[in-house]
């Protein structure tokens, strides 16, 4: 499926769950820094997404944190019980295979494409921060989609993923 078809499939899935969204179209962006000028007016929690690989078990992890978080992969690996030094950024081919999105498009909204190979880690600040909306790319890095934290969790669980919720403020 191409990007437009994947986005339409995502929108259909969200509609089937009666999840309302707000979408802002913007130029294609590849980093949080490029994205923020286009969406900083949107009130809520903006995301940074890391697609990682566990070098020992060959497992995949999608880690979604607040956009301004700095993540130490060794500390994260210890928290996840995979051992320090065992998490690496996965290559684009793996992301395309597992989530059907490429570089700059990593998003938890792509979890509906995963067959259960990707573990999902979510920053607890998305759920505990009192945010009206949480924002992610809708299968394209030329748009940003907002939905309520409750609806987001409903969507994630509907994909068959039980998020590992971590408090990154403790690090």
Swiss-Prot record:
> Which residue windows are transmembrane per the record?
none
Query: What Gene3D superfamilies would the database entry show?
Result: YbaK/aminoacyl-tRNA synthetase-associated domain (3.90.960.10)
Q: Which GO terms describe its molecular function?
A: aminoacyl-tRNA deacylase activity
Q: Which Pfam families match?
A: tRNA_edit
Return the SUPFAM superfamilies for the record.
Answer: YbaK/ProRS associated domain (SSF55826)
Output the CDD domains linked to this UniProt entry.
Answer: PrdX_deacylase
Family statement: Belongs to the PRORSD1 family.
Q: What is this protein called?
A: Prolyl-tRNA synthetase associated domain-containing protein 1
Native organism is: Bos taurus (Bovine)
The gene designation is: PRORSD1
């Amino acid at each position: 499926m191409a990007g437009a078809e994947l986005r339409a499939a995502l929108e259909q899935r969200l509609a089937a769950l009666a999840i309302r969204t707000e979408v802002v179209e913007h130029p294609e962006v590849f980093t949080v820094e490029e994205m923020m000028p286009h969406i900083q007016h949107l009130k809520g929690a903006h995301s940074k997404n890391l697609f990682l690989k566990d070098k020992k078990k060959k497992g995949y992890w999608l880690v979604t944190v607040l956009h301004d978080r700095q993540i130490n992969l060794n500390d994260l690996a210890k928290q996840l019980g995979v051992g320090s030094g065992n998490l690496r950024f996965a290559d684009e081919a793996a992301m395309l295979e597992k989530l059907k999105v490429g570089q700059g498009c990593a998003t938890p909204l792509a979890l509906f494409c995963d067959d259960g190979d990707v573990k999902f880690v979510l920053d607890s600040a998305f759920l505990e921060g009192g945010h009206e909306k949480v924002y992610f790319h809708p299968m394209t890095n030329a748009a940003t989609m907002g939905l309520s934290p409750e609806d987001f969790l409903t969507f994630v669980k509907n994909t068959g993923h039980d998020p590992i919720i971590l408090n990154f403020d403790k690090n």
